[in-house]
């Protein structure tokens, strides 16, 4: 099915308007990873990621993305912070698979920044796996990853993260569940909200060579979507909605003021007051301009969604000798019991124990 999705989505990408291309590249990349089509995933992410950076840094699309006078769904899609972070997370997996942990680490660090509270300059990422893998890549490269590990553990809460094992040669990335969906709400449809559905799969377990490798949930994208820097997000769309309400209020008040001033055009003796006339004209002009500004503002939330993201992410590192190792993958419910119909056999193939083998596992 993922392979069919890749083909169908590729056709849609070919005909997609420029504003939607990154969205389709995200979707195809995720589906390609699950289908084992790693070259295709790499192509799509390498097409999407430079555009993300370009829009954030400076371009005509950047100015448009900040504009208050363009409908949100008319802008070039780059996604919410959790979506952009996931693009870098997936790209890092491919870098590590290609024997480039240094580039993988750069991706993790970029994802951390994207997922931080930049507006208040708190620089506090709450994506535990990004921090953990940042430190793990450092440890593999012979550097000190203890700071990143400490951040990851603080973010993971009750989940006790394993200490780094630089000698581990099998890196297991797992994902399960269905990620968040976007909806619009509010008076003007300006509030971006998320529909979330808790996945029956809360954790996973890979049994290989008689050893059970736990794959506990480290990060929940439902939580990541609704927060930034560990706090409830205040989207830029919220500011636009306030702007629309404020300009409406200014416009109404100004028009009322012009009517009052017009009523005072004549003094009690019947003579025309030039000052009142000028005030009435000025207030009426402000009122009309405010109304026009408010009408031109389009604060509707952008509900375009990278809809094939998972809900939960996990990671484990192990040591295995060279060879093909049959393994059993189970997805577990909240009580730790295997979910019926979710168990399958996978083959872990280690070609060279001196180099890292990257395994990517996804719930069907």
Regions found by a protein language model. Name each.
Residues 10-19, 52-64, 69-79, 115-124, ...:
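Flexible helix-coil transition and linker loops at the boundaries of alpha-helical arrays
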Residues 35, 98, 139-142:
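Structural motif corresponding to the intra-repeat A-B loop/turn of tetratricopeptide repeats
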Residues 20-23, 78-85, 126-128:
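Start-of-helix signal in alpha-solenoid helical-repeat scaffolds, especially tetratricopeptide repeats
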Residues 264-364:
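C-terminal soluble interaction/assembly domains
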Residues 1-10, 42-52, 57-68, 100-114, ...:
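Helix-turn-helix repeat elements of alpha-solenoid scaffolds
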């Amino acid at each position: 099915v993922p392979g069919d999705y890749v083909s169908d989505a590729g056709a849609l990408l070919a005909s997609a308007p420029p504003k939607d291309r990154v969205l389709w590249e995200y979707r195809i990349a995720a589906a390609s990873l699950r289908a084992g089509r790693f070259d295709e995933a790499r192509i799509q992410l390498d097409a999407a990621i430079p555009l993300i950076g370009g829009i954030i840094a400076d371009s005509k699309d950047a100015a448009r993305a900040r504009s208050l006078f363009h409908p949100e769904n008319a802008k070039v899609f780059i996604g919410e912070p959790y979506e952009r972070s996931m693009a870098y997370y997936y790209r890092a997996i491919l870098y590590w698979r290609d024997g480039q942990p240094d580039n993988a680490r750069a991706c993790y660090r970029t994802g951390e920044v994207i997922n931080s509270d930049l507006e208040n300059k708190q620089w506090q990422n709450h994506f535990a796996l990004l921090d953990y893998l940042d430190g793990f890549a450092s440890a593999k490269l012979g550097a000190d990853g203890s700071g990143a590990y400490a951040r990851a553990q603080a973010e993971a809460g009750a989940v006790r993260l394993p200490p780094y094992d630089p000698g581990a040669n099998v890196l297991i990335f797992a994902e399960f569940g269905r990620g968040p969906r976007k909806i619009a709400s509010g008076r003007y449809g300006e509030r971006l909200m998320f529909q979330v559905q808790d996945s029956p799969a809360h954790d996973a377990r890979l049994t290989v060579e008689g050893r059970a490798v736990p794959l506990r949930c480290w990060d929940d994208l439902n939580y990541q979507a609704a927060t930034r820097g560990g706090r409830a997000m205040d989207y830029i769309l919220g500011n636009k909605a306030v702007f629309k309400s404020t300009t409406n209020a200014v416009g109404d008040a100004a028009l009322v003021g012009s009517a009052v001033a017009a009523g005072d055009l004549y003094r009690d003796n019947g003579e025309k007051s030039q000052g009142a006339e000028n005030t009435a004209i000025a207030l009426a002009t402000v009122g009309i301009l405010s109304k026009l500004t408010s009408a031109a503002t389009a604060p509707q939330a952008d509900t375009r969604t990278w809809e094939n993201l998972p809900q939960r992410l996990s990671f484990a590192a192990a040591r295995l000798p060279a060879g093909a190792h049959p393994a059993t993958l189970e997805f577990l419910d909240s009580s730790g019991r295997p979910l019926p119909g979710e168990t399958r056999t996978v083959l872990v193939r280690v070609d060279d124990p001196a180099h890292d083998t990257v395994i990517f596992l996804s719930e069907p």
